[in-house]
Amino acid sequence: MIRMEHLNHHGNLYAGQGIEWMIENSFIVINCEYGDPQGLLYKNTHKFDFYSSVNPGDIVYYEGLIVRTGKTSITIRVGLYDEKTDILRAEGFTTFVSVDPKTGKPVPHGIVLDEPADEEEVRWREEADSYFKKK
């Protein structure tokens, strides 16, 4: 539930708070797959876009899915949804890197993605790939 301490000066969910929760959700999703929280290191938030205001008293939930893997990187698409309507209110992508907990150096994670479940997941994967194309 969105409380007063989560708000910005406009009276809506503060983006920094939304991003913090998005990163936490991403970490939980990856940790469930990878299994070693000590071996995960946050690398980047690629975007976090609001599609509608999130207001005090709104009940929301985050839903994340791994949409891209590199040798050591793992990218998650996270959506922020309205609990009552399931309407997407915001979304973003974050990337973590698998590391050796003792050395902090990147190590292969071994995560292999299944085939996309639907066209929406295909779009999410394509968007995630676009963040890694050399410009």
What positions do the PLM features span?
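Catalytic strand-loop segment that frames the active site of acyl-thioester-processing enzymes
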Residues: 1-14, 18, 119-135
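Hydrophobic residues in beta-strands and at strand termini
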Residues: 2-3, 50, 98
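Short capping/connector residues at structural and topological boundaries
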Residues: 12, 18, 53-55, 112
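Short acidic/polar alpha-helix capping motifs at helix-coil junctions
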Residues: 12-14, 24, 58
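Short, residue-level hotspots on alpha-helical faces of the histone-fold
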Residues: 20-24, 28
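Hydrophobic beta-strand-centered segment that forms part of the acyl-chain substrate-binding groove
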Residues: 27-63, 67-74, 87-93
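HotDog/MaoC-like acyl-thioester-processing domains
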Residues: 55-56, 67-135
